[in-house]
């Protein structure tokens, strides 16, 4: 099974959307194997968004993600990265399809409720930035045989 990183951003936490995001992930059949609420330190935020360091919006992005608590998760499932990205929707909520998290709840590209890894490499990097190995729980859902034809 593939793992990916998902984070409910400060706007999602402040608007009470944490449960909605978790519910959508779980109803899709994905499994949460790690989760915590934290207030991201500036250094961690800069590492998380390192690929945007030279872009003009970098400082504002770091300011925003450190402005309030977030909920960080490791989510597991078959094709988890692609499945989660589809559930989340386009980065710009105005372009996100109805029925996606951003399409239903996002109002602004800078306040788009949730972050999700976009590749296996970014998932691995982001998971290791936010979680130690002993914080990730390996467990089997009772309904996995009903969700996946093959595992």
Swiss-Prot record:
**Which enzyme class?**
transferase
Catalyzes what? Answer: a 2'-deoxyribonucleoside 5'-diphosphate + ATP = a 2'-deoxyribonucleoside 5'-triphosphate + ADP; a ribonucleoside 5'-diphosphate + ATP = a ribonucleoside 5'-triphosphate + ADP
- The answer to whether the entry has keyword Transferase is yes
GO terms (molecular function) for this protein are: ATP binding; metal ion binding; nucleoside diphosphate kinase activity
* Classification via SMART domains: NDK
- Active site at which residues? 115
Q: Where does this protein reside within or beyond the cell?
A: Cytoplasm
Q: Which cofactor does it need?
A: Mg(2+)
InterPro entries in UniProt: NDK-like_dom (IPR034907), NDK-like_dom_sf (IPR036850), Nucleoside_diP_kinase (IPR001564), Nucleoside_diP_kinase_AS (IPR023005)
Q: Where are the transmembrane segments?
A: none
Which residues participate in ATP binding? 9, 57, 85, 91, 102, 112
Q: EC no.? A: 2.7.4.6
Which keywords are on file for this protein? Answer: ATP-binding, Cytoplasm, Kinase, Magnesium, Metal-binding, Nucleotide metabolism, Nucleotide-binding, Phosphoprotein, Transferase
What is one cellular component GO term in this UniProt entry? cytoplasm
Q: Which GO terms describe its biological process?
A: CTP biosynthetic process; GTP biosynthetic process; UTP biosynthetic process
| NADP in keyword set | no
Q: Which domain of life is it from?
A: Archaea
Q: Per the similarity annotation, which family is this?
A: Belongs to the NDK family.
What does the function comment of this entry state? Major role in the synthesis of nucleoside triphosphates other than ATP. The ATP gamma phosphate is transferred to the NDP beta phosphate via a ping-pong mechanism, using a phosphorylated active-site intermediate.
Q: What is this protein called?
A: Nucleoside diphosphate kinase
UniProt source species: Archaeoglobus fulgidus (strain ATCC 49558 / DSM 4304 / JCM 9628 / NBRC 100126 / VC-16)
Source gene? Answer: ndk
């Amino acid at each position: 099974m593939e793992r990916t990183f998902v984070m409910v951003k400060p706007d999602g936490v402040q608007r009470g959307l944490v449960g909605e995001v978790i519910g959508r992930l779980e109803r899709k059949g994905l499994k949460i194997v790690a989760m915590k609420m934290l207030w991201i330190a500036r250094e961690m935020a800069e590492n998380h968004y390192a690929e945007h360091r030279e872009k003009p919006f970098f400082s504002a992005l770091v300011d925003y993600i450190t402005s309030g608590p977030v909920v960080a998760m490791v989510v597991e499932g078959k094709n988890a990265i692609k499945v989660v990205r589809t559930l989340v929707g386009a980065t710009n909520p105005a372009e996100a399809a109805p029925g996606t998290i951003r399409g239903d709840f996002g109002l602004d590209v800078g306040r788009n409720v949730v972050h999700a890894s976009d590749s296996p490499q970014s998932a691995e990097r982001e998971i290791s930035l936010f979680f130690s190995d002993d914080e990730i729980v390996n467990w089997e859902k009772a309904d996995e045989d009903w969700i996946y034809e093959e595992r």
